[in-house]
């Protein structure tokens, strides 16, 4: 038994991109949209997703997290590694770390050098970043003031460790920047976050859907698991999906287009299950081939990161807030006033550096955290501490996503192939050693205790490599598995249209040709804003005329205030 309905557009996935498209397309009178989301609602009374400081909670369990695992990663001691992905209205913007980082201007200028992607330069993209954003301190040439995404800048009076860590980075010889999303990304400075003025997570469900839900032309179905995209010949005409635990396939038809916004894991999986992908993969599973497209699921990229943890000699870290007896007061202050520790994701400082002159723009990212704990909330150090998250930005390693079954409830096979190049290993060795130099600068003298992790005995290349193999974790930035472009491995063109098919687009982080320098939520929203104008037949926003930093022949680093020698 099937039931059927018809809409202008069907959007698969109510995440960072899907919600953006749903809101923008329904701004046009009479345009009907069906938005399908495999997860549930974004319950506004659930502190796990709404309180910024509770960011570790939605990663635990499977209510809001698909909780994928990789195949054994061959260069990481064959570990099966986490691959968390958001499930529910908001997608990964419902469970992410809320770091608002756009990437480096050179990322987009690099995309624009590819044939067919000429209009993806930084100055073409910047107007769409601005369109999406409302920054709490007001708009300027780089930031918006009227968009659906609430962005909060760190305020005076926040934790002194943030300021000490930025100062230490500057004392180590690296630049200072007052805005990681402004004129110059390179350097250390305050980190913006997607949090509302009253201290709530600013997911795309809150920012975009709250307005769009008021329109009768938008239909949202939660707990709707997409089985496959329906085709007539080479034209996408609809979607078959399941609701809840039912095995009844419901069919919905799209008069204009099907818009796939499942993210870098689900989008290639859904394409392959629908008969679009490498023919040899589909044939093994007896999936009828609609279109042999070898790049679907290939080119998978991510950011890997390490934690360097230190004891804190003054009682200024967030360690007491991890204790259950302190949490009711923190929760009450957040609930009723929208302020306090609960209102921040606690990633309020960070930076981007070049580990050597070989890189034209930053290849290492830092997040600073005034507590020593794993990102997913596990293995908290039982004392006052602080840590730096450090990771490489544009690894040459490439992975893949492959469907394992026709069953939409079966997870795909995921392999990132982390650390498969010598460049990866050199960047992590350099990153750890540079971080140690930063941590030894005078600004941290009042706070710095012993090195908890990796530990001062971990010094040689071999020891550092072993530590990375055992302890590096994902930064939860999968991307690039349905890349834009014109070469034989490209899946979509510069407007997200799937090569060789009609009426089907992919719009999410999977279409990035190369991963950006930083967190992926802001770029994903920008991509959706930009392609929304294409779908609507609107003229693109005028190119920005803002200036932006290009390192050129400037050195990656100046002379440090305190010289640190590395033990052999």
Curated annotation (Swiss-Prot):
GO molecular function, one term: flavin adenine dinucleotide binding
SUPFAM superfamilies in UniProt: FAD-linked reductases, C-terminal domain, FAD/NAD(P)-binding domain
Pathway involvement of the protein, from the record: Amine and polyamine biosynthesis; betaine biosynthesis via choline pathway; betaine aldehyde from choline (cytochrome c reductase route): step 1/1
GO biological process assignments: glycine betaine biosynthetic process from choline
Pfam families: GMC_oxred_C, GMC_oxred_N
Presence of keyword tRNA-binding: no
Protein's UniProt name: Oxygen-dependent choline dehydrogenase
Organism of derivation: Pseudomonas savastanoi pv. phaseolicola (strain 1448A / Race 6)
Organism phylogeny: Bacteria, Pseudomonadati, Pseudomonadota, Gammaproteobacteria, Pseudomonadales
């Amino acid at each position: 038994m099937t039931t059927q309905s018809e809409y202008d557009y069907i959007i698969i996935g109510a995440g960072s991109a899907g919600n953006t498209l749903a809101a923008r397309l329904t701004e046009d009178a009479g345009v009907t949209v069906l938005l399908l989301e495999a997860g549930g609602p974004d319950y506004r009374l659930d502190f796990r997703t709404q309180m910024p400081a509770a960011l570790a909670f939605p990663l635990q369990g499977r209510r809001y997290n698909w909780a994928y695992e990789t195949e054994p990663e061959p260069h990481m001691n064959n570990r099966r590694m986490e691959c968390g992905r958001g499930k529910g209205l908001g997608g990964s913007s419902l469970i992410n770390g809320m770091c608002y980082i756009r990437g480096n201007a050179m990322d987009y200028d690099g995309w624009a050098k590819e044939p067919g992607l000429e209009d993806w330069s930084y100055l073409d993209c910047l107007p769409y970043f601005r369109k999406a954003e409302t920054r709490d301190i007001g708009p300027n040439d780089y930031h918006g003031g009227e968009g659906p995404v609430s962005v909060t800048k760190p305020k005076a009076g926040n934790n002194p460790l943030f300021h000490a860590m930025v100062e230490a980075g500057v004392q180590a010889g690296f630049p200072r920047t007052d805005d990681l999303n402004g004129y110059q990304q390179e350097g250390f400075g305050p980190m913006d976050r997607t949090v509302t003025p009253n201290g709530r997570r600013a997911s795309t469900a809150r920012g975009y859907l709250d307005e769009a839900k008021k329109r009768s032309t938008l239909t949202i179905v939660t707990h709707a698991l997409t089985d496959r995209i329906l085709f007539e010949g080479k034209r996408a005409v609809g979607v078959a999906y399941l609701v809840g635990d039912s095995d009844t396939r419901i069919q919905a038809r799209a008069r204009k287009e099907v818009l796939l916004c499942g993210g870098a894991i689900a989008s290639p999986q859904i394409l392959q299950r629908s008969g679009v992908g490498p023919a040899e993969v589909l044939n093994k599973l007896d999936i009828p081939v609609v279109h042999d497209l070898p790049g679907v699921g290939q080119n998978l990229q991510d950011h890997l990161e390490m934690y360097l943890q230190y004891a804190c000699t003054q009682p200024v870290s967030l360690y007491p807030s991890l204790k259950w007896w302190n949490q009711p007061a923190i929760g009450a202050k957040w609930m009723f006033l929208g302020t306090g520790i609960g209102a921040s994701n606690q990633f309020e400082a960070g930076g981007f550096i070049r580990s050597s002159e070989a890189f034209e723009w930053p290849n290492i990212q830092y997040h600073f955290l005034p507590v020593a704990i794993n990102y997913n909330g596990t293995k908290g150090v039982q004392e006052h501490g602080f840590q730096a998250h450090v990771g490489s930005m544009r690894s040459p390693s490439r992975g893949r996503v492959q469907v394992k079954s026709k069953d939409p409830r079966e997870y795909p096979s995921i392999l990132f192939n982390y650390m498969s190049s010598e460049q990866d290993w050199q960047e992590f060795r350099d990153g750890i050693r540079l971080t140690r130099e930063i941590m030894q600068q005078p600004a941290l003298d009042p706070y710095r205790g012993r090195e908890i992790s990796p530990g001062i005995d971990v010094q040689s290349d071999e020891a550092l490599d072993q530590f990375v193999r055992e302890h590096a974790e994902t930064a939860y930035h999968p991307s690039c598995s349905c890349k834009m472009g014109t070469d034989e491995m490209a899946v979509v063109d510069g407007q997200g249209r799937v090569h060789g098919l009609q009426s089907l687009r992919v719009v999410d982080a999977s279409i990035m040709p190369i991963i950006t320098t930083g967190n992926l939520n802001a770029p994903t929203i920008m991509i959706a804003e930009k392609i929304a104008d294409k779908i609507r037949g609107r003229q693109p926003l005028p190119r920005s005329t803002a200036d932006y930093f290009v390192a050129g022949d400037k050195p990656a680093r100046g002379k440090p205030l305190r010289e640190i020698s590395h033990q052999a």
